[in-house]
Amino acid sequence: HNVGSLGNLAVETSRMENVEELRSYFDLNVFKVISLNTQFLKIFEEVEDRIIIVNITSLCAIKPMGGMAYYCSGKAAREMYFKVLADEKKHIKVLNYSPGPVETDMIGYVLEEAVNENLRDVFTSFKNQGTLLKPEITAKKCMKVLLAGKFSPGEHVDYFD
């Protein structure tokens, strides 16, 4: 599961009062993921012992980052859903994989839209120091983790682990 959007980076956490905007964010990033996963599991119920589910998560799911309340709370909710699924369905392999700072359009979006100065500084340093990961590099690491199979059910595994 790799759907994801950042949400509104122009609003401070203490000013998040647009309920429709919140609903829309959580609908895409949490509720639709749960719904899709539920339908998938219904269809493949007979082969559950061969199912591997990978949720693309973020360090933001477990560590708060000022200016990213939508993103952090959405990733945290989704990651917990998959941890509970792993606890209930012990024969399904579930991995919460955090790919690290990846060179995608997300970086530019944060630099343009974020009102939180510290957040912009963090992402600017990723970009300027060349620490952004190419998508294919972090995807290879995810595959290594999956093939090694040494992760606990629902575990959060970061690229840098």
Each predicted region: which residue ranges?
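Catalytic Tyr-X3-Lys loop
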Residues: 5, 15-35, 78
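Catalytic loop of short-chain dehydrogenase/reductase
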Residues: 5-6, 19, 45, 50-77, ...
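Conserved NAD(P)H cofactor-binding loop of Rossmann-fold oxidoreductase domains
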Residues: 2-10
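C-terminal helical subdomain
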Residues: 96-99, 114-161
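Short-chain dehydrogenase/reductase
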Residues: 26, 30, 37, 41, 67-76, 82, 131-132, 139
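Amphipathic alpha-helical dimer-interface segment in Rossmann-like NAD(P)H-dependent oxidoreductases
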Residues: 27-49, 87
